[in-house]
A protein has these predicted regions:
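N-terminal cationic leader/targeting segments used for protein routing and processing
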Residues: 9-10, 26-28, 64, 80
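N-terminal processing/targeting junctions
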Residues: 22-23, 34, 77
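Short Cys/His-rich "knuckle" micro-motifs
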Residues: 13-16, 39-41
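Cys/His-rich microdomains that often coordinate metals
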Residues: 10-11, 36
């Protein structure tokens, strides 16, 4: 399994998480999942400044994002604006 954000490959005892629903289901390593989860919580709470901060952090981590990850991020961006 490979992280859809940073491209990290799963090794023995590594945790990977599945996020999203429908067409935009993505697999994330634990570090990327933590930041992505914070983005979703910021979205629910209406915290635009924190959302932008976590989005920037996730963008820095995204060395080789997949198309599914980009689609998932665009869906979140459309909800905040």
């Amino acid at each position: 399994m490979i992280c859809d954000c940073c491209g990290k490959k799963k090794r023995l005892l590594d945790m990977f998480y599945s996020m999203g629903d429908g067409q935009s289901k993505i697999n994330l390593c634990s570090e990327c999942q933590y930041v992505a989860r914070r983005m979703e919580l910021d979205l629910q709470g209406g915290e635009k400044e924190l959302y932008d901060l976590h989005r920037y952090q996730l963008r820095k981590r995204a060395k080789a994002p997949t198309e599914a990850f980009c689609l998932w991020q665009r869906e979140l961006d459309s909800k905040i604006q």
